[in-house]
Amino acid sequence: MLQNPELHYLDNAATTIVAPEVADVIDKAMREHWANPSSLYGPSARSEEALNAARAAVARTLGCKAKELYFTSCGSESNNLALLGAARTRTFGKDIVVSGFEHPSVQRPLEDLAKRGYNVTVVKPRTDGTLDINEMLEHVGKNTILVACMMVNNEVGTRNDVERLAAEVKRRNSRTIVHVDAVQAWMRVPIKLDNIDTLAVSGHKIHAPKGIGALYLSDRLVQAFQPPYLGGEQERGLRPGTENLPYAMGLAAAAARLAKTMKSRDTAMRALNQRLRDGLAAFPEVVLNSPADAVPEVLNFSENCIKSETMLAFLAEAQIYVSSASACGRGQPSHTLAAMGRDPLAIDTAIRVSFCADNTPEDVDAFLNRFEDGMKHLQRIKK
């Protein structure tokens, strides 16, 4: 999708470039479906019909009913809506269990709930970035109102067995709400919603624009769910505010586009990931933070020599774009790597490369060549 062959974009876990066909859908929707879907005249009825079609299309990719799918502005809003709503909905206890390497949009709401008297237990990941599901389950009891766990980690790409976690949580306490942040998983790995109550996805990770996301809310929970927002009956009262119909249609188009190519994309991503792993093996200073069984779209490593911001700036001078951590934690050390037990040097020198289907072997080679130059010439950290 990039017109400049000299530009190598390898930060797709932060955001993806909007697909041209998705942009076309949005542009057409802005011109043809301008009416408010909630109004009562003819053009509004057509807008409502288009909104319902978009909702059904996104729901199909998740394997849920259309009425269980609610449009939001992004994955972060979906997480906030689910978590704060869960606390308002379940009043039989104050206990919450969460993994120790969640996105800030999960961390911060739970930190706020802790200040308001909730007992939030944080379970650290193993040193390889995987989560001990059994340890999570040890903390689930009769007063546990919520368990939250991301499906794919946004920094190191590790995948958590949220299906097993959800099933075991429900065996221990059927009233416990299970929330999953699937922002980095959606359209990359299969998602099974059995025993999951709420699940967040985002558009700008799948070549839709920024400003659109969705929340799955199970039929099991919808009648009791108490959303934290007030002010309108849009999205069946869950999320007030006039719906962003063009972007909802764009989200549906982006999801449908990727649904056709999940297997072939996985093969291509694995080849790119392995090419990068093989190239990095030439540098004895490099330690991989992403385990071999992480999703192939993400490879995180520490070069243990040069500050991340120095290396990133050097790469950017050659129009090679990667990151050092989550874009939502800009300027902050990686809490994921810290939770994995990495030392300060490894955290300060970490780099995340993340792929999409538009990336090529040439992108990987350009990165490796420039990275080699940086390792030779940039100022090293004094140990």
Question: Can you describe what each PLM-predicted range is?
Answer:
Residues 1-383:
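Pyridoxal 5′-phosphate
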